[in-house]
Each structure stands twice: as structure tokens, then as C-alpha cells.
Regions:
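N-terminal export/targeting and maturation segments
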Residues: 13-82
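Hydrophobic membrane-insertion alpha-helices, especially the h-region
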Residues: 1-19
Length: 144
């Protein structure tokens, strides 16, 4: 009987973990925080976020573009993105996030020529970079 209680607690924890991941997916977080929908054909390669009770801190999500998808008219339409160099603040954000999470598929610092789009909302920042050579999007978030 005493063994039953720890087993039930472990099972409850596992259920809460999987239900939480289903409810609070990366895509739902981008929609809730930034109003961005992730189109079909973008495959999440990596995702990192700081553990935080309030959801603040750094996040990094890397998406790979699958063959023959149209991104026209979406947030990820790199034809509408800026090609100018990165600002010092943007480079600092990339360095901070990269140093914190050490992603396997991270972008080179300083990044080679990339397409970029930045959104600022509620004091937070979302920096989206598209690397045409890698055919990947890198989303750097700083939630305050």
C-alpha cells in the first residue's frame, strides 16, 4: 500500500507533463505571445526555453523549411524581410541565447548574410532570421 502512493504520484506527473506539452506547444506560444502562426511545411528542429514560472526569459526555436512550400503572406515570408546587417542589440541577443542553450543547429556568430524581421511587444523581442544557405529560420525570443 505504501508503494502505491509514490507510483500514483509518478504517473500523475507523467500525465501532467504530456498534457502540458500538448496544450503549451511551441506553435501555441508563438501565437499567444506574438500573434504568429507557423505554416504547414516548417519542421521544428530544436526548441529551448528557460524554466520560469512567469514564462519570461530567453527562447530559441529553429525551423527547417520543407520542400516546395509557399510562405507568401506569412510572417515567415523572407521576400518581405529586411536584408540589412544586424544591430549591436540583435547580435547581443543572438550571443546571449546561443551561450545559454548551445544549440546543435545554431547560427554562426556573427551570422553570414541573413534575412531578418523583428517584433517588439510588451517589452519583449522576437528576432526571426532566415538563413537561405541552411534553409532554416531561427527565432530568438526575449520575454520580459
Amino acid at each position: 500500500m505504501l508503494l502505491l502512493i509514490p507510483v500514483l504520484l509518478i504517473l500523475a506527473g507523467i500525465v501532467v507533463y504530456f498534457v502540458g506539452n500538448a496544450i503549451f506547444s511551441t506553435e501555441k506560444g508563438l501565437q499567444a505571445n506574438w500573434g504568429i502562426s507557423v505554416p504547414e511545411g516548417l519542421r521544428e528542429v530544436e526548441h529551448y526555453e528557460e524554466s520560469s514560472f512567469h514564462g519570461d526569459g530567453y527562447r530559441l526555436t529553429i525551423y527547417e523549411v520543407q520542400a516546395d512550400i509557399s510562405l507568401n503572406g506569412t510572417f515567415f515570408d523572407y521576400g518581405d524581410m529586411d536584408r540589412e546587417g544586424l544591430t549591436e542589440a540583435q547580435v547581443a541577443l543572438i550571443e546571449n541565447v546561443t551561450n545559454q542553450f548551445d544549440p546543435k543547429n545554431g547560427i554562426a556568430i556573427p551570422p553570414r548574410e541573413v534575412y531578418k524581421r523583428q517584433v517588439a511587444k510588451f517589452g519583449g523581442i522576437l528576432l526571426c532570421l532566415y538563413d537561405a544557405t541552411e534553409n532554416k529560420f531561427f527565432l530568438y525570443e526575449e520575454i520580459l
